[in-house]
Amino acid sequence: QYGAPGTEFKVYADGVYVSDKPMGPFTYQKHNPMSYKPGGFVQGAGHGGTFEDAYGNYWHVATCMLSLKYKFERRIGLYPTAFDKDGVMYSNTAFGDYPLLTPKGKVDDIANTFSGWMLLSYGKPVMASSMDSTLVPENVTDESMRTFWSARSGEPGEWLQISLEGLKEVRAIQLNYYEHRAVQHN
């Protein structure tokens, strides 16, 4: 595996070289990149590594672009990974922003790790007790990791409310915590 260049961009990737010998020569895998995520809440999926879990399933851990406090600021993404019938390694990053099912055994098809739970809050009405400058409540439902809401004070009693505009079955809640005004690391 290799981390492709492009850290300065919002989208970058990981690829694979293959060989029959540990010291090479190496050739470019038939399909690359093996990990790439150009859109959605999280973008990037590069400069990572792959591991095998206790059941024999493969997972790719990769960095995802944030770049708000510093140009190389990142978060970590986790994507199911497999090898096709020709031995070509690939990762499924399509629903990397959504909850995955934790395998309780060997997974035959990595698409089966997708929970099917879809985003209910996108673009829905939001109300809040207050806001800090331009960090409006609507940022909470815009499906961007790079925007966020902040209450004016951060004191007890601040709140945020999202209307799902009807009765919905909620299977999970995802909170993206951002270190707004954090000073412990300059």
Predicted regions and their residues:
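Beta-propeller blade signature
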Residues: 13-22, 76-84
